[in-house]
Design a protein with these regions (language model features):
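Short amphipathic alpha-helical interface segments
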Residues: 148-153, 161-163
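Positively charged
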Residues: 1-151
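Short, charged/polar micro-motifs that form catalytic or ligand-binding hotspots
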Residues: 23, 64, 152, 156, ...
């Protein structure tokens, strides 16, 4: 039978999931949650954190809380302006919520410690290497993880710790985070993370492709604007000659005198032809 944790001060979390082996700041604002933190500080600093199913619920019952949470140890507590309490906690282990035994003056719960399931060592080692390789690719593309964070992930040898560290760093929604917390099989957890990393890499490739297309389109538009401005300046220098064909010829003579590359020269010459045709269409009949 798994070890029971009875009478643990409990903080329902909104908008986040805490994993074992992770050190994280929590900003606590609700009165009952602050009292739970204070109670834990007065005892052994052990606290249970469980994510709410619906962030909009202000006074959750046991039915409003996820089945799986995390047992944490408070490392530091600070009181901030506005009645907020900021705690630095370190995740210890996964816990399954058995019951909320009290909601006043703060939440108290009974929990069962839940151990991760380690399968075939060879399979786990393969997953560990794959996750670290994929994570390295993603971190290089995303630029959202510090060098220290990347190094820490790359140095991990425990596949369970690796899964929790990478899950914490990935840009995923809380439903997916909770799903990873509740998955006890380390192999399946790592497999899920590989899938998420592959998807993030595909999204990154697509974003880069879109950005390149936009940049090329903007560069083309800027170049065309530059060429038209060149023609306008040449035209202004020549003055209005009246005859579109003569004017186009004079523009070409002026163009030859400019020190331009062959590509730019060809583009401007095409614009002169287009410009000449426009003048022919718009010139008044004699």
């Amino acid at each position: 039978m798994n070890l029971l944790e009875v009478g643990i001060p409990t903080v329902p979390l909104r908008g986040m999931v805490v994993y074992p082996n992770i050190v994280i700041h929590l900003d606590i604002g609700r009165d009952k949650s602050i009292k739970a933190v204070e109670a834990a500080m007065n005892e052994d600093r052990i606290l249970a954190v469980v994510t709410q199913k619906d962030d909009a619920v202000d006074a959750p019952t046991v039915h409003d809380l996820a089945q799986m949470g995390t047992l944490v140890k408070i490392k530091q507590m600070l009181r901030l302006p506005g009645g907020i309490v900021r705690v630095l906690v370190e995740g210890i282990t996964r816990i399954r919520l058995m019951n909320i035994t009290s909601m006043d003056p703060y939440y108290i719960g009974d929990y069962e410690r839940v151990a991760s399931e380690f399968e075939d060592d060879v399979e786990l080692e393969a997953y560990r290497r794959l996750v670290q390789a994929k994570f390295g690719e993603w971190a290089e593309e995303a630029k959202s993880v510090t060098d220290e964070g990347v190094t820490r992930v790359m140095e991990l040898r425990n596949p369970c710790e690796l899964a929790d560290q990478v899950a914490f760093l990935l840009p995923i929604n809380n439903l997916k985070r909770q799903e990873l917390l509740e998955e006890l099989s380390v192999a399946r957890r790592l497999n899920m993370i590989v899938g998420i990393l592959n998807m993030e890499l595909q999204i990154s490739d697509l974003e880069n492709s879109i950005n390149n297309q936009v940049r090329q389109s903007m560069e083309k538009a800027q170049k065309e604007y530059f060429l038209r401005e060149k023609i306008r300046v040449i035209h202004d220098e020549l003055g209005d000659k009246g005859d579109p064909e003569e004017e186009a010829e004079e523009l070409r003579v002026k163009l030859k005198a400019l020190n331009l590359s062959e590509d730019v020269h060809t583009r401007i010459d095409k614009e002169i032809s287009r410009y000449s045709r426009c003048l022919l269409y718009t010139s008044p009949s004699p």
